[in-house]
Amino acid sequence: VFAAVSWTSTSATPLQAQQVELATPEDGEPPSPPERSVPSRRPVKEKIPIHHLGATDSPPLPGQPWKIHDRYRPRPKVVQPGETPDAPPSDATILFDGQGLDAWCHHGEEDLWYVPMWLVEDDQLVVEPHTGSLYTIDSFGSCQLHLEWMIPEGTKGNSQGRGNSGIKFMELFEVQILDSFSNRTYADGQAGAIYGQYPPLVNAVKPQGQWQVYDIFFEAPRFEQEELVRPAYLTVVLNGVLVQNHRQLAGPTGARAPVYRPGTPAAPIMLQDHGNRIRFRNIWIRELPEDTSHR
């Protein structure tokens, strides 16, 4: 039989010893040792095998200065994604978040800029018809653009006269905005079209009163000594549906014959005033490197 001694005291009496009987272990069974706390260990830093960091003797990649799994190839920078698919990532530039039009202007004669006359209502950017198109104050070349737009319910008209607007990259290359839900028009002029050049692969437009979502990837044309060495390309996703798959542009879009002319590597993005009260929200942009093939 094992016993333990404990001490009790009160404010009026000194400490007194009390004998406490403990349970008697079964015959032939040794008593359990007292439990001891084990001090926690610091986590051991994981050692990564050197071959997991890349190779130095692997075959070269055709057309690139790197080898397969090249140990010395630069690793991508870290970008924090948005909390939702439509939220801007950490490296995005906010063009409109419902708070104001500081990123935009109208263009006047002789390249003069003036204050936007479009409206901000309910955290939305609203076209004020016949006040002129809006332009970003900053210039952009190759980029990823996220933009949400809506044709207000009850918008009247037909064909190109119903819910018409557009997004022009470098003021030259237009992705069409139009109410294309049960509204017939020419194929390369409906929503999702690269205006005048490519119809969308499918018509993915929602009815009036619902928000439409564009995610557009634009590769700017490149010139060397005024010679075109790479044309422009556009990839367009409308409402989660791929409608333009890395299309090579024949030149600036529009009704005229497309012809490339040397210009600056970057220019403003334009939102078109076509006389219809289109609504926009949540516009952000990411600048993309001009050439990613060797990264």
Specify the residue positions occupied by each region the protein language model found.
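Carbohydrate-interacting regions of secretory-pathway proteins
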Residues: V20-R295
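Signal peptide processing junction and immediate N-terminal pro/mature segment
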Residues: A4-L22
